[in-house]
Structures are given as C-alpha cells and as structure tokens.
Swiss-Prot record:
Any GO MF annotation of the entry: oxidoreductase activity
Protein name per its UniProtKB record: Fruit protein pKIWI502
TM segment ranges: none
InterPro entries in UniProt: FAD-bd_FR_type (IPR017927), FNR_nucleotide-bd (IPR039261), OxRdtase_FAD/NAD-bd (IPR001433), Riboflavin_synthase-like_b-brl (IPR017938)
Species, as recorded: Actinidia deliciosa (Kiwi)
Region called Disordered, residue ranges: 1-29
Upper classification of the organism: Eukaryota, Viridiplantae, Streptophyta, Embryophyta, Tracheophyta
Domain FAD-binding FR-type, first and last residues per copy: 71-182
Length: 317
C-alpha cells in the first residue's frame, strides 16, 4: 500500500522520504511518516509438515505479514459537501451518529483516518486516501460529525468525495496516530510564544489544533504562518477573524499572489525569519504541519535558535 506525496508549491522542492506511502496531491496534509497499520490479534500457532510447533515469534511474524494492510472499516454517511474556496476546495462532512467508536477515539488534533470509496459508488474505486480530521475533538463530541478539508483532484478519492451527496456512504478506518503532544507546550504561562506553521491542506489539522484550544489568549505571542498558492486555495479564511480574536495572529503567505496582494509572499519559513524575533527560545513552542520540506527546514531553524526539539510538535504515529 502506498501513498503518493506531491510537492506543494509552498516549500522548496524535495523528494519524499517515505516511499511506502502515496498521497494524492490534495492530501499534502496527511502525515508523511505514516506507515500501514497492522492489527495483530491472538496469533495462531502453526505446525509445519514435520509436526513441530513453530515458535510463537515465527507465528507472530506470519500473522503480521498476513495482516499488514488490515484496517477496521466503518461505513458512514455523507452529511454535507460544501465549497471551501474558489478553486476545487471543499469541506466534506460525515455523520458519526451511528459510529460511537470513531467519536470516542478521536481525542487529539492531528489524528487522521483513511477513507475508502465503496464499489457501489465507483467501480473500480480509486485508491483509499488519508485525511486529517479538521474538526476539533470537543466539537466532534457535540455534533457527532467529522469535517475534512479536501481539494478535488481528478481520478482520485478526493474527486469522488467532493462530488458526493447527502446520504452517500463511504468507509472510514479507525482513528490513526496520536496527534499533537500538546502537553509539551502547557501551561500557557510557561510557553508564551507559540509558532504554528502550516502549508496547503495541512490546515485541516491546524484548524483542529487552534479551535480545540491551547490557551492562546493566555500567551503573549501566538502566530499562524499559513502558506498556500493563492487565496483561491486557502481554506478557512472565514475563520481568521475568530482565530485572531482567540489570540492567534494569522499571517497568510502566498507563493503565487495576485498583483494587488500586500501580504507575505514566498515560503512560510522565510517569512518567519523576516518577522520579529522570538522573545526567548526556552519558552517557545511550535506546531508544524504540511509539506515535509517545510517541516524539516522550520524545525532546523528553530532548533538553531535554541528552541527545544521536544517543544516543536508534529503529528505522531
């Protein structure tokens, strides 16, 4: 099973370091470090033709090989598909009212699922794809819905998802990953500076992080560097005012700006370097989401400035 990782225009070109994963170009938000998950139940002991019992370790290895691509799939209906920006960007919302396990196990921003299109909708179906959950966990518990920020790309799962109607049913895996280790930057009084750098549709996890709450209004310097090609590919612009009101300074960064654009231009990591210096690296945290090249470059910059690696959050398997 593989995911193709496209290169968003917001970061310098780089080859994917994760050949075992393929990611549709609309899925630059999916965790680049993800590996297929195997669910190992009680291994069955096997005998070879001489009747000798294979070792438990050997049985486990065999069982793992058989189950290496196994997921637990849950059918869920589409609730709504809404336009999120002008250029083929959509909010896809699924109904979890009959899927309590998905609701219960989504506990941290940065967690994600794989989505599969059933043959009843498209036959043959496109390859399943990974998507960050854009809803904050607390809102999911209340509304019993997952929202995904998805760009429609021809010939992919994303294109089908963005064309579905209310009541259409898709399959979701169990929740994958542990999300962001937010405890590393708590309490807010001890880490008054938090830098959030996001590229492309990584804003799904970014929205979940910001709206779940991390005490932004109790910190003195919280910045969101949000990179996209242009405003037509930048999701959640309608939420920027609310994020600003919560204590997050939003800095849109465009790699292909229109002629009348007066904001930041280029790579988010370069825009950060041109911004005001952080007050104290020892009391600074960061959240990095999106293109692997941006994540690695930004992490390197922050570490060189004295920020602890433990305080630089990325999603966890």
């Amino acid at each position: 099973m593989s995911i193709t990782l496209s290169r968003p225009s917001l970061s310098r070109p780089s080859l994917s370091r994760h050949p075992s994963l393929t990611l549709h170009s609309s899925l630059s938000h999916a965790p680049p470090h993800h590996r297929p998950v195997a669910f190992l139940r009680h291994p069955t002991l096997r005998y070879h033709h001489h009747g000798r019992l294979l070792s438990v370790a050997s049985a486990i290895l065999q069982d793992t090989a058989i189950r290496q691509d196994t997921y637990i799939w849950t059918p869920v209906p589409i609730s709504r598909v809404l336009p999120a920006a002008a250029e083929s960007l959509f909010k896809v919302i699924v109904d979890l009212s009959r899927s309590p396990d998905l609701v219960y196990n989504f506990v941290s921003p940065g967690q994600y699922v794989q989505i599969r299109i059933p043959e009843a909708i498209v036959n043959p179906p496109p390859r399943p794809a990974y998507f960050y959950i854009a809803s904050p966990p607390s809102l999911v518990k209340k509304n019993l819905e997952f929202e995904f920020l998805i760009r429609s790309v021809p010939g992919t799962t994303s294109e089908v998802l963005c064309s579905l109607k209310e009541g259409d049913v898709v399959d979701l895996t169990q929740i994958i990953g542990r999300g962001f280790d937010i405890e590393q930057i708590l309490p807010p009084e001890d880490y008054p500076t938090v830098l959030i750098s996001v590229t492309g549709y990584g804003m799904s996890a970014g929205r979940s992080f910001i709206e779940e709450g991390f005490g932004a209004n109790k910190r003195s310097d919280v910045r969101l560097y949000y990179g996209a090609e242009n405003l037509e590919t930048m999701g959640y612009q309608e939420r920027f005012k609310d994020w600003e009101a919560s204590g997050v300074r939003v800095i849109p960064v465009l790699s292909r700006p229109p002629p009348n654009w007066n904001g930041a231009v280029g790579y988010v990591q370069d825009v950060y370097l041109k911004d005001k210096p952080i007050a104290d690296p020892r009391t600074t945290g960061a959240v990095l989401i999106g293109n692997p090249n941006m994540v690695e470059e930004t992490r390197g910059i922050l570490v060189a400035q004295g920020v602890s690696r433990e305080k630089i959050l990325v999603t966890q398997d």
